[in-house]
């Protein structure tokens, strides 16, 4: 793993901006809102609420050779009703085959009682493992709202429409926030569908799409299981704890790379990480008490596996306060920057455990070897319940 750099102790999430301490769950609810506001203002940029109008063109089901069904629903978001400008998004819904559904109902009693559990998969790839477990998969092609062009001053259809109709300075959102906003719009659609159980939604994505899944899931309690995979910098990885060769804030916000992903001005913290008012365990604490799983490769050096492990440890006290200590999870596998069958299997085990009470088939709470001891990372703890 090599040398681990600790720029500063990980900040205390239990201290309000005015210096007061969190003592109760009610205090945390207020502090949670404060943290969300700070993270958006400083790191990701502020984002608009739901559009004033959404038009939906429901696609026709296509029977697939393997017995599954697929359709494409076309959505048009109007930031301002009647303004004549909309933002298009296509969501691909895939339903499991009858054989897969029967097998899932046998394995998980209650499966499909109020509609099927569903996975919102950020990106265009098919999530085969979820379908085989009896989950509806909704593919969210986030690049329709905001392209992924390295080193460019990106402004995709979503941000451009809001700038034109609401005002150029109305929202400071970067690309990750724009993608998360689109994920929320996809969830708006999912919870309206009779095929889907709105109480059994999970979100996942890998790499930049893992950053999206984490931010979207942190801000939207309708995501009952949140799984960022290999999300690294601006995702589940710490800015303050870095393994040798891991992406840091300077690399992320370089004008030659992905500076457009974050809020304007966030690059000012590059090289001055010790002045950051937060670290990524604050973002992950917003998911609590809902189940949160990071899936990581031990050789995925650029994604900062040791920093992700450190941030996992620093998220735990919030889960402890909220009475859900086992819902904060992490899983490491051998290998590099990929979204593997092993990752998917652990994620779906957690979904089955959450939605159907199935036992976990593995221990997803293993801290990466070489992670600095907790007392080197932070000294604060959850208030006593």
Where is each model-derived feature located?
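Flexible loop/turn segments at secondary-structure boundaries
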Residues: 127-128, 145-148, 210-213, 233-238, ...
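Aromatic-residue-lined binding/catalytic grooves and analogous aromatic/hydrophobic interfacial grooves
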Residues: 93-97, 183, 188, 267
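Primarily recognizes the serine-hydrolase "nucleophile elbow" in alpha/beta-hydrolase
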Residues: 185-246, 272
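Alpha/beta-hydrolase-fold serine-hydrolase catalytic core, especially in secreted/extracellular enzymes
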Residues: 1-90, 95-101, 108-114, 263, ...
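Cap/lid segment of the alpha/beta-hydrolase catalytic domain
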Residues: 111-195, 232-241
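Loop/turn elements at helix/coil->beta-strand transitions in domains of secreted/extracellular proteins
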Residues: 115-119, 133-136, 197-200, 221-225, ...
């Amino acid at each position: 793993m090599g040398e681990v750099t600790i720029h500063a102790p990980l900040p205390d999430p239990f201290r309000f901006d005015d210096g007061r301490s969190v003592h109760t769950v009610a205090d945390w609810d207020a502090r949670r809102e404060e943290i969300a506001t700070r993270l958006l203002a400083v790191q990701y940029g502020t984002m608009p609420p739901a559009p004033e109008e959404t038009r939906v063109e429901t696609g026709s089901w296509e029977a697939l050779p393997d017995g599954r069904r697929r359709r494409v629903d076309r959505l048009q978001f109007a930031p301002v009703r009647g303004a004549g400008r909309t933002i298009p998004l296509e969501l691909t819904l895939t339903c499991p085959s009858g054989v897969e559904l029967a097998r899932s109902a046998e394995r998980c009693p209650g499966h499909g009682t109020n509609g099927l559990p569903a996975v919102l998969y950020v990106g265009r790839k098919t999530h085969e493992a979820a379908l085989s477990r009896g989950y509806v998969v909704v593919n969210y092609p986030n690049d329709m709202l905001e392209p992924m062009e390295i080193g460019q001053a990106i402004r995709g259809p979503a941000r451009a429409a809001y700038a034109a109709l609401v005002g150029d300075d109305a929202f400071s959102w970067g690309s990750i926030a724009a993608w998360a906003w689109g994920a929320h719009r996809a969830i708006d659609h999912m919870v309206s569908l009779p095929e889907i159980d709105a109480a059994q939604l999970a979100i996942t994505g890998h790499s930049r799409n893992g950053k999206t899944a984490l931010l979207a899931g942190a801000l939207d309690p309708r995501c009952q299981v949140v799984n960022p995979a290999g999300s690294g910098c601006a995702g589940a990885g710490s800015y303050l704890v870095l393994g040798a060769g891991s992406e840091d804030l300077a690399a992320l916000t370089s004008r030659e790379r992905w500076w457009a992903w974050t809020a304007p001005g966030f690059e000012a913290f590059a090289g001055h990480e010790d002045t950051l008012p937060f670290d990524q365990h604050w973002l992950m604490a917003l998911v609590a008490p809902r189940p949160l799983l990071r899936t990581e490769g031990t050789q995925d050096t650029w994604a900062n596996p040791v920093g992700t492990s450190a941030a996992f440890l620093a998220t735990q006290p919030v889960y402890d306060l909220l009475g859900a200590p086992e819902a904060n999870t992490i899983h490491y596998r051998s290998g590099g920057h990929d979204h593997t069958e092993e990752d998917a299997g652990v994620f779906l085990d957690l979904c089955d455990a959450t939605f159907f009470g199935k036992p976990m088939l593995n221990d997803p709470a293993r801290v990466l070897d070489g992670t600095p001891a907790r007392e080197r990372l932070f000294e604060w703890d959850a208030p006593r319940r």
